[in-house]
Amino acid sequence: MKKNNYILCFTLALLFSWAVPSVAAPLECTLEKNALPEQIKAYTQCLDAKLNRVQQEQDSWIQKRTFELSALESETGNTQILSLFKLSINAKDNYIQRSCQWRYMLKQPNAQQAVVTYKECEIAMTEQFIQQLKTAL
């Protein structure tokens, strides 16, 4: 029984040590000025991966703030706190979508450049929102 626990702990520690650097390492995407279509495709895929990481970080911060605000709501009895926070999250999602859409439309009819612009916009705005979520209550 003890041996199984040691094996389990070792396996979990190994998995955790393998997973942490990949999550913690920032993903940098670069695109040359006169890039070929294959390079643009690779850049777009890199932006997709970066956007996924940024959205995961955002989701973690939203969950953390939701938990904190729920506790604060139960302490104070103010039932508007959490609902206002959730409304602000929805408003932020709409703002990012619309703001990046008009930037996308500016780059049309060049579809590749438009997609890159949209993804870069979404990443930048999500990172800005994460910084706001990190601000202490």
Language-model segments: which ranges?
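Bacterial N-terminal signal peptides that target proteins for export
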Residues: 1-10
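N-terminal leader/targeting segments
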Residues: 3, 21-24
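Bacterial N-terminal signal peptides
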Residues: 9-18
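N-terminal alpha-helical modules
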Residues: 23-137
